[in-house]
């Protein structure tokens, strides 16, 4: 069990388990490089030490979300724009993803969590594509919670890919122009079948959404914290959820 929930008093725990509990939480895990710079005296040997420390933060966040009954948790791991970073950093990040897939698979099995990856996965190294496919296949029968990693993801890229596929289906007369609706477009997105996020958390304090789930977050509640991702704990997640529960969602009405 998450240490944060173990330490929560009964009133706090009951409050967190009461509605409205977000069914789908999305997190922009920002601040890894700033954390590394802040701790550079300990991080000189590795260009992605901050990202490695950030990866260590993930299990307790997943545990806490699952224990609370969150149905889906989406983590923004690598954007389409991140390819503009140095080849060395990008290669090390992909190596980190590979190692995490291997080391955390038993974690997912133990908790019966289904893994899903979204983004333009075809642009990833073949080894990483293969490992993602294996991990997704190995957990596809689980239903406790769905953990979604956005890798080489950009919302504009997602929409372009979706519209190309939709156009192809129109051309092949699989669908008609009159069938096009918000629901149909959503079914062509990487997140097809998932509820739109109820809560979007951004760590690191930046006030922007960074080309993340732009279609899906039309009515999502936003929560920004100055805490850098490697320092983000289950307590910080609970604070975000408490803030969400105190808001009145109107869906644009």
UniProtKB/Swiss-Prot annotation:
A GO BP annotation: polyprenol biosynthetic process
UniProt binding sites for Mg(2+): 30, 221
The keyword Cell membrane belongs to this UniProt entry's keyword annotation: no
EC number(s) given by UniProt: 2.5.1.-
Keyword check for Magnesium: yes
Cross-referenced SUPFAM superfamilies: Undecaprenyl diphosphate synthase
Keyword vocabulary terms for this entry: Magnesium, Metal-binding, Transferase
Active site: 30, 82
Binding site for substrate: 31-35, 51, 79-81, 83, 85, 202, 208-210
PROSITE patterns found in the cross-reference section: UPP_SYNTHASE
Residues passing through the membrane, by range: none
Cofactor list: Mg(2+)
Gene Ontology terms for molecular function: ditrans,polycis-polyprenyl diphosphate synthase [(2E,6E)-farnesyl diphosphate specific] activity; magnesium ion binding
Cofactor note (record): Binds 2 magnesium ions per subunit.
HAMAP family: ISPT
Function text: Catalyzes the condensation of isopentenyl diphosphate (IPP) with allylic pyrophosphates generating different type of terpenoids.
Listed NCBIfam families: PRK14840.1, uppS
Family from the record: Belongs to the UPP synthase family.
Subunit structure: Homodimer.
Record protein name field: Isoprenyl transferase
């Amino acid at each position: 069990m998450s240490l944060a929930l173990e330490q929560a008093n009964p009133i706090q725990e009951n409050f967190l388990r009461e509605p409205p509990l977000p069914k789908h939480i999305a997190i922009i895990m920002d601040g890894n490089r700033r954390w590394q710079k802040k701790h550079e005296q300990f991080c000189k040997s590795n260009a992605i030490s901050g990202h490695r420390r950030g990866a260590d933060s993930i299990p307790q966040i997943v545990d806490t979300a699952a224990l609370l009954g969150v149905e889906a948790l989406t983590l923004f791991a690598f954007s389409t724009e991140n390819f503009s970073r140095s080849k060395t950093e990008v290669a090390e990040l992909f190596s980190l993803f590979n190692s995490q897939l291997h080391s955390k698979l038993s974690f997912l099995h133990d908790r019966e969590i289904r893994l899903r990856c979204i983004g333009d996965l075809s642009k990833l190294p073949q080894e990483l594509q293969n490992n993602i496919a294996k991990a997704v296949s190995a957990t596809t029968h689980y239903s406790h919670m769905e953990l979604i990693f956005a890798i080489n993801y950009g919302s504009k890229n997602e929409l372009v890919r979706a519209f190309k596929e939709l156009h192809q289906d129109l051309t092949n007369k699989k669908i008609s122009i009159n069938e096009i609706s918000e629901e149909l477009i959503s079914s062509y997105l990487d997140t097809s079948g998932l509820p739109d996020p109820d809560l979007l958390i951004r760590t690191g304090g930046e006030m922007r959404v960074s080309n993340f789930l732009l279609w899906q977050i039309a009515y999502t509640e936003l929560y920004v914290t100055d805490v850098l991702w490697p320092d983000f704990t289950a307590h910080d997640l609970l604070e975000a959820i408490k803030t969400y529960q105190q808001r009145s969602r109107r869906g644009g009405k």
